[in-house]
Amino acid sequence: MLKCDICGKGPLAGYQYSHSHRKSIRKWKPNIKKVRAIVDDTPVRLHVCTKCLKAGKVQRAL
């Protein structure tokens, strides 16, 4: 599964409870986008979560 190249956010695992409280394992996946960003004055493809994109932690390439 993908991780954010900026903050390192990745999938989390936990339990999903039914109405009768039986447990089944499920995953929460981060919203990760493939973005062309500028790193050291060169455009590079990065996997970035939308929280980092909204916060402006990535300078996007045109």
UniProtKB/Swiss-Prot annotation:
GO cellular component: ribonucleoprotein complex; ribosome
GO biological process: translation
Gene Ontology terms, MF aspect: structural constituent of ribosome
Signal peptide residues on this chain, from the entry's feature table: none
Alphabetized SUPFAM superfamilies for the sequence: L28p-like
InterPro entries according to UniProt: Bacterial_rp_bL28, Ribosomal_bL28, Ribosomal_bL28/bL31-like_sf, Ribosomal_bL28_bact-type, Ribosomal_bL28_sf
Record flagged with keyword Ribosomal protein: yes
Keywords: Ribonucleoprotein, Ribosomal protein
Pfam families (alphabetical): Ribosomal_L28 (PF00830)
PANTHER family for the chain: 50S RIBOSOMAL PROTEIN L28, LARGE RIBOSOMAL SUBUNIT PROTEIN BL28A
Similarity remark: Belongs to the bacterial ribosomal protein bL28 family.
Protein known as: Large ribosomal subunit protein bL28
Gene source species: Thermoanaerobacter pseudethanolicus (strain ATCC 33223 / 39E) (Clostridium thermohydrosulfuricum)
